[in-house]
Swiss-Prot record:
InterPro entries: Frog_Litoria
Keyword set includes Secreted: yes
Domain of life: Eukaryota
Major subcellular location class: secreted
Pfam families xrefs: Antimicrobial24 (PF16049)
Job description of the protein: Has no antimicrobial activity. Strongly inhibits the formation of NO by neuronal nitric oxide synthase at micromolar concentrations.
Protein name stated in the entry: Dahlein-5.4
Keywords: Amphibian defense peptide, Secreted
Gene Ontology MF terms in the entry: nitric-oxide synthase regulator activity
Location of this chain's protein in the cell: Secreted
Length: 21
């Protein structure tokens, strides 16, 4: 659903932000 889609986007954003370079 909509919340699931938002969760995927936020999760991916946080994963990229927290990922060590």
């Amino acid at each position: 659903g909509l919340l699931g889609s938002i969760g995927k986007v936020l999760g991916g954003y946080l994963a990229e932000k927290l990922k060590p370079k």
